[in-house]
Amino acid sequence: MSDTEDLAALNDRLMAKNHALAEALNRAGKELTKAKSRLAQLAQPPLTFATMVKVDSTRTDADGIQHASAEVISGTRRMVVPVASNVNAARLTAGATVMLNEKLVLVEQRDADTVGQIRSVKQVLDDGRLIVTDASGNPVLIRRSGALAYADINQGDRIIVDPSVRLAIEALPAEGDKDLVLEETPDVTFADIGGLDSEIGRIRDAVQLPFRHRALFERYDLKPPKGVLLYGPPGNGKTMIAKAVANALCEGGYDSNGDGSISPAETRVKGVFLSVKGPELLNKYVGESERLIRLIFQRARERAADGNPVVVFIDEMDSLLRTRGSGVSSDVETTIVPQFLSELDGVESLDNVMVIGASNRVDMIDPAVLRPGRLDVKIRVGRPKTNQAIAIVDHYLTDDLPLENGVDAHALSAVLVHDIYGTSERRHLCDVQEENGQWHALFLADVVSGAMLKNIVDRAKTRAVKESIETGSDVALTVPLLAAAVEDEYRETRDSMADVDPEQWSRINGMDPIRRIRTAE
């Protein structure tokens, strides 16, 4: 190979090397540019969030450049800051979130924050300002943001406030007291309740008569009762009775003549049933329980304003209206009871509103609540007697169930009840010692309830279902199946007696005070 050819080959190699170096330098330059961009981004000072209050001043110079300042709140600092010329000051709205640069210049406006502290509106002033309270009841006077300038805000509404608690940012939907006050039409009727004819008659007289025969009540200058108390041991139908009353009220169009017709003078009315969860009204924050009670009665008055009857049903009333001074660690009842009584007896009329309370422990309810003129009618819903128990069981043992041949449902009910109410040793639960020191035997019949009767029938039905699955055909409900269900209930009840507190158990079950319990072997 000649020298010329060698030089040409070397030149080619050097040119290729130069191209590679140029590409490498180009790539390095791009990477360096990216790195500088990243460094520049990292070197940018942080922006500070603030809440816009109002435009403090604004003017435009001869060159058309805007010179404006704005009042903002950042944390707890209240400041007047300059507004960047590229931000239109006319579009800055109170309550909006704005950004401040390192020199505290307003450089950007964003939407108002959708999270923050929640306050309750205590009062709306004539100029639109709001007095709001926190969970402890501490009042604060605040302004409205631009978004709420013309919003309809009422006492009791909830709002979101800015971090400094100076501006109302957003109005929230009405507080979820619907979880506490359930407006409903229950599907339970008086026909679904067995063995409580006397109690049902009394409560119908107390609740339905005043609304069925308004003219007669006015003619005799008779005021309907303000309230009814259903009390007695648990599981015997207090809540079912209240639901049946609600069902009758909500359906309207009562049978006032007893023959399915409505007299010409009768006014057809349709009622409202407000169910209150008593224990959930209790709140650890001062004044909150009282506020909820006010809301409940306010809602009742609103529903009753058009003349329709309203029933406010308070279950577990003893948990809410406990005797004042009986608290162990606190005495919240000292303010809750007076608030309830003021709503019941207060200046604002409770026309067409009736309170129905249910309690297992009437001895724990404040005596002021129980006096005449408040809860006028007191109905004890006690344990069922034999005939009442049969009537209850008849609702759950019906002729359309698979029964053994030649036996009707009523006969099975009678056999079941007589087994439960037997006083032989096989139904002996325990011996109890009264306060006078005397011992006496306690049988299953002494603690029976409507709920227990239903549970026994359900046990028998469950056993029949299991046997039907095993055999592949319907297994009839028989006396032995029912007897086995009674035996299971008896054993569970007997075993549970060993772990109860005698004094507390006797009070809950509406019995005379018991000092000791000696379980059966």
Swiss-Prot record:
Give all cystine bridges in this chain: none
> What does the record list as coiled-coil region(s)?
4-44
PANTHER family recorded: AAA-FAMILY ATPASE (PTHR23077), PROTEASOME-ASSOCIATED ATPASE (PTHR23077:SF144)
Which BP terms in the Gene Ontology apply to this protein?
modification-dependent protein catabolic process; proteasomal protein catabolic process
- Record's GO cellular component terms: proteasome complex
Gene3D superfamilies per the UniProt record, alphabetical: 1.10.8.60, Nucleic acid-binding proteins (2.40.50.140), P-loop containing nucleotide triphosphate hydrolases (3.40.50.300)
Q: NCBIfam families from the xrefs? A: pup_AAA
Domain of life of the organism encoding this protein: Bacteria
The protein's name is: AAA ATPase forming ring-shaped complexes
What protein family is recorded? Belongs to the AAA ATPase family.
Quote the subunit structure annotation: Homohexamer. Assembles into a hexameric ring structure.
Residues the entry annotates as binding ATP: 235-240
